[in-house]
Amino acid sequence: MMMNGQKMAAAEVAVQLPESKMVTENIGGAAAAMRPFGRKAEVMNVLLRVLCMVTSVAALSSMVTAQQSSTVSIYGFMLPIQSKWSFSHSFEYVVGVSAVVAAHSLLQLLISVSRLLRKSPVIQSRSHAWLVFAGDQVFAYAMISAGAAASGVTNLNRTGIRHTALPNFCKPLQSFCDHVAVSIFFTFLSCFLLAASAVQEVIWLSRSKY
């Protein structure tokens, strides 16, 4: 009787082992589907967030420090002029969008780093990926529109207006124009980094099964 009981127990174990193996394989497959990216790609995503935050803060700080006073000659008269970023709606737009993008990048960076430290997927689901993708797309378009608007104003300051006596204001206001140019450069760079993040999310969505 004892021998028969031991044989039955061994048979039950033999039957249960394949089932346990199948459950483990299913869990592993689900985890792989939820993490189509490797750790290197997730670290790259975090690095993009860091760079985007740095460039947007640089664009913001360069613009808000753009102010200068000088004199300019118009029809032979020396007139005092003062230039400040807040005098232009386009420059104010750059400041506002850069601040929002910096906050967005910081939030995504904190979320990604916390999940990396817990060794969990940076992107948890398709809905999360779609949400982040939409945010990156919207902010990328906002940054490129802000940079384009600021570029138009800056170009006018550098060239003046044809057929009028208005001069090249960037000659007496060189420091102001340099600050604005640096801000515009970082604005377009932030747009590129947001676009790169959006491409990563598209790749994640194409590889994910859930």
From Swiss-Prot:
The chain crosses the membrane at residues 46-66, 93-113, 129-149, 179-199. Keywords: Cell membrane, Glycoprotein, Membrane, Transmembrane, Transmembrane helix. Glycans are attached at N157. It comes from the Eukaryota. Signal peptide: none annotated. It is found in: Cell membrane. Belongs to the Casparian strip membrane proteins (CASP) family. This is CASP-like protein 3A2. It comes from Populus trichocarpa (Western balsam poplar).
